[in-house]
Amino acid sequence: MTQLEWRTIFANNLLCILREKGMSQSQLARDSGLSVSRISEYINMISTPTIFAIINIAYALDMDVNELVDFDSRIV
């Protein structure tokens, strides 16, 4: 899997989860300790999240990291 493919799948998962939870990017940024611009970069596939960011996002979404990066479970 290429880095671009990984970013695409992660972004799609994140968007789907945000919709499921009725959560905005701003709320996720606040709850995860990341900036709104950083969350936007992940969703728009501009940058690849660090493991630190993935852990913080998963915690903010009240889910296991594995659920967040499960590349077979969600389709937007």
What residues fall within each predicted segment?
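Residue-level detection of the helix-turn-helix DNA-binding "recognition helix"
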Residues: 19, 33, 44, 73
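Short alpha-helical elements of helix-turn-helix
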Residues: 11-12, 37, 51-54
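The alpha-helix within a helix-turn-helix
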Residues: 18, 29, 58
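DNA major-groove recognition helix of helix-turn-helix
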Residues: 43, 61, 69-72
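A short, Lys/Arg-rich alpha-helix, primarily the initiator
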Residues: 1-23
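DNA major-groove recognition helix of helix-turn-helix/homeodomain DNA-binding modules
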Residues: 52-67
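Short alpha-helical DNA-recognition segment
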Residues: 22-41
